[in-house]
Amino acid sequence: MTARWSSPVRYVECDQQGVVFNAHYLTWTDEASYDWWTAHGLPWEDLVARGIDPLVKASSLEWTSAARWGDTVTVDAITEEVGRTSVTVRFTVRVGEQVCCVVRTTYVCASGGVAAPWPDDVRARLTEG
């Protein structure tokens, strides 16, 4: 199941080289992650209300081209792997058809401040599509 988020590149997101500063790619994937969770029928506020707190364990970024001020970026999010206590999501950031960056983020299910297995219904939704 793919979720999509899109936004114009803002001037404030660019550095002196005229390209998007690297940290903003993680901001965009964080925005896209909300849509990804929601697409799986797991809105963030519902997870939190149940005491489920997905925490970022790791993110890796691999750039292939730059996004610049005035571009519109699109982030596609897709489930890459579901573990007992974790899920890895691949975010592809692009301008038009040009891939700018691929980000892989692993979230760990936490409950009460410690890692916990995904509840069965959550795991089932994460593995759909």
PLM region spans:
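Short alpha-helix capping/helix-loop boundary micro-motifs
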Residues: A58-E62
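HotDog/MaoC-like acyl-thioester-processing domains
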Residues: M1-W5, W63, A67-T72, T79-G129
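Hot-dog-fold acyl-thioester-processing enzymes
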Residues: M1-V56, S111-G129
